[in-house]
C-alpha cells in the first residue's frame, strides 16, 4: 500500500504511548482469523472515538491497513476480510473529512488514483490532510482515466493535482501514462505524485517535470506553500 509505511515516519508524534497502539493493533488483527466482526468493530470504533483523529489515523488506521494488506499477501486472511477492513478504514477517514468545514477559499487541489489503480487509502489520506489545511479539495478516488482527469482540471483550474501510485508500472505502461499526464493534465494543473510506485519511477516523472513527493511531511510542506500563495492572491 503506497505511502502507508512512510506516513508513520513523517506523521507528528502521537501523545499516547506507542505500546498502546501496538497492543490495540494486535487485538484488532486477532479478530480477523478467526473472523469476529462484533469485537473488531467495537474495538476499532472505541479506539478511534477517544483520540484525536490525526493520532488515530497515523497510530491505528494506516498501520492497520498496512498489516492487513501484508496478512492478505501472505495468505493468512481472505481477500474478502481485507476488503472489509479497508472499507471500515475508508469510512473512518470519510467521516472525519465530512466533519471539516467546506473550504470556499484557499488552494484548489485535485486528488486521484491513476487509471487501473484501485487502492485509494493513501490518496484518501492525502485528501484528508489537504482538507485539514484548508484546501478546496476535489477527491476523485480510484481508477481515474487521464482524459476525465484532464477534463476536470480544465474546468476547475486546480493549483495542484496529486496522483497516488502504490506500485511501479512496467516501463512501457509507465512511459505511456506519464506522457499522457504531461500532455493532457499538465497544461491545466501542476502535477505531483506519491507512493512507492512513484518513487520507483522517479526519473521518468522528473523528466516530464512532475513533482515526486517522498512522504507526507513533504506533502505538508508543499500544501503550506500553496496556502500561503493562495492567501497572498486573495
List each language-model region with its residue ranges:
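C-terminal regulatory/effector modules of DNA-binding transcriptional regulators
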Residues: 75-234
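Long amphipathic alpha-helical segments
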Residues: 1-101
Amino acid at each position: 500500500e503506497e505511502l502507508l509505511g512512510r506516513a508513520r515516519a513523517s506523521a507528528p508524534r502521537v501523545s499516547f504511548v506507542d505500546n498502546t497502539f501496538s497492543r490495540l493493533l494486535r487485538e484488532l488483527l486477532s479478530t480477523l482469523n478467526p473472523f469476529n466482526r462484533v469485537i473488531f468493530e467495537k474495538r476499532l470504533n472505541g479506539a478511534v472515538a477517544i483520540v484525536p483523529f490525526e493520532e488515530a489515523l497515523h497510530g491505528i488506521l494506516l498501520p492497520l491497513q498496512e498489516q492487513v494488506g501484508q496478512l492478505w499477501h501472505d495468505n493468512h486472511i481472505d481477500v474478502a476480510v481485507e476488503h472489509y477492513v479497508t472499507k471500515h478504514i475508508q469510512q473512518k477517514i470519510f467521516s472525519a473529512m465530512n466533519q471539516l468545514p467546506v473550504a470556499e477559499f484557499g488552494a484548489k487541489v485535485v486528488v486521484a488514483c491513476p487509471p487501473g489503480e484501485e487502492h485509494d487509502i493513501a490518496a484518501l489520506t492525502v485528501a484528508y490532510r489537504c482538507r485539514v489545511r484548508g484546501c478546496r479539495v476535489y477527491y476523485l478516488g480510484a481508477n481515474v482515466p487521464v482524459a476525465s482527469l484532464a477534463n476536470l482540471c480544465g474546468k476547475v483550474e486546480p493549483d495542484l493535482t496529486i496522483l497516488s501510485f502504490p506500485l511501479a508500472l512496467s516501463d512501457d505502461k509507465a512511459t505511456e501514462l506519464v506522457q499522457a499526464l504531461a500532455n493532457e493534465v499538465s497544461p491545466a494543473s501542476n502535477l505531483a505524485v506519491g507512493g512507492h510506485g512513484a518513487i520507483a519511477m522517479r526519473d521518468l516523472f522528473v523528466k516530464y517535470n512532475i513533482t515526486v513527493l517522498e512522504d507526507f511531511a513533504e506533502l505538508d510542506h508543499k500544501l503550506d506553500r500553496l496556502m500561503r500563495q493562495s492567501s497572498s492572491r486573495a
